[in-house]
């Protein structure tokens, strides 16, 4: 689905990613793990066009989209959800869902909203509430639901369970699995709870100092000695 080749990127003159090569497989969950400051979130931002790319390629559907701006990537059915959630606080939940389908015709938007509400029934009783009044979990449900309305093919999630209770975080993980299994979404995940994220994933990458330290199936990463050291809080990764 997405192939990253020799990617070097950062912010202005500050380079964060160095010679990154990765393959995000279609219809799979791929999790990126690593210590704080290793470039995980920057990797997602770079794929969506929010950083400066010095060199390298991002191949999507046989085209290099490295220089394509974010609004065009959204039209290409690539969705990026930062930790802060992409919701409009002054609009209702229902209005947010409708806006998410702005590039679709009216009948298609209605159909996609019904699909989103089937995955996130928690939103049904709060459709008339302003998004700014929602809890953290409700905002996350809304942001992910908006991606479904948009009919996204690729969904990039940056720490979707941050500041949520363990119980609610598990609900989010279950929703991610459902979006892959029932709708074939390609999902790229950065998550604080790296172990749990890998447990629901197909593949994974570990970043250290802006480089891919190792990659493999989720099971291979979970059993890798370096990941075990990282999980135990050992800094010498």
Swiss-Prot record:
ATP binds at residues 34-41. InterPro entries: AAA+_ATPase, ABC_transporter-like_ATP-bd, BCAA_Transport_ATP-bd_LivF, P-loop_NTPase. GO terms for biological process: branched-chain amino acid transport; L-amino acid transport. Residues 2-234 form the ABC transporter domain. GO terms for molecular function: ATP binding; ATP hydrolysis activity. Keywords: Amino-acid transport, ATP-binding, Nucleotide-binding, Transport. Pfam families: ABC_tran. Probable component of a branched-chain amino-acid transport system. Belongs to the ABC transporter superfamily. This is Probable branched-chain amino acid transport ATP-binding protein LivF. It comes from Methanocaldococcus jannaschii (strain ATCC 43067 / DSM 2661 / JAL-1 / JCM 10045 / NBRC 100440). The lineage of its organism: Archaea, Methanobacteriati, Methanobacteriota, Methanomada group, Methanococci.
């Amino acid at each position: 689905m997405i192939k990253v080749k020799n990617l070097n990127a950062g912010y202005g003159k500050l380079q964060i990613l160095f010679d990154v090569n990765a393959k995000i497989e279609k219809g799979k969950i791929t999790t990126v793990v690593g210590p704080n400051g290793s470039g995980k979130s920057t990797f997602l931002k770079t794929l969506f066009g929010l950083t400066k790319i010095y060199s390298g390629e991002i191949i999507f559907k046989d085209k290099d989209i490295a220089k394509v701006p974010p609004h065009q990537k959204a039209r290409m059915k690539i969705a990026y959800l930062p930790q802060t959630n992409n919701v409009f606080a002054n609009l209702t939940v229902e209005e947010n869902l409708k806006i998410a389908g702005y590039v679709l015709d009216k009948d298609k938007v209605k159909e996609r909203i019904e699909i989103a509400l089937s995955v996130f029934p928690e939103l049904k009783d709060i459709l008339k509430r302003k998004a700014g009044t929602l809890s953290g979990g409700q905002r996350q449900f809304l942001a992910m639901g908006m991606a479904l309305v948009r009919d996204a093919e690729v969904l990039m999630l940056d720490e979707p369970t941050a500041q949520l209770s363990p119980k609610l975080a598990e609900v989010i993980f279950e929703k991610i699995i459902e979006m892959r299994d029932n709708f074939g979404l390609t999902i790229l995940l950065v998550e604080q709870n790296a172990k749990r994220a890998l447990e629901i994933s197909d593949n994974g990458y570990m970043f250290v100092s802006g480089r891919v330290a190792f990659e493999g199936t989720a099971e291979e990463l979970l059993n890798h000695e370096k990941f075990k050291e990282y999980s135990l809080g050992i800094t010498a990764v």
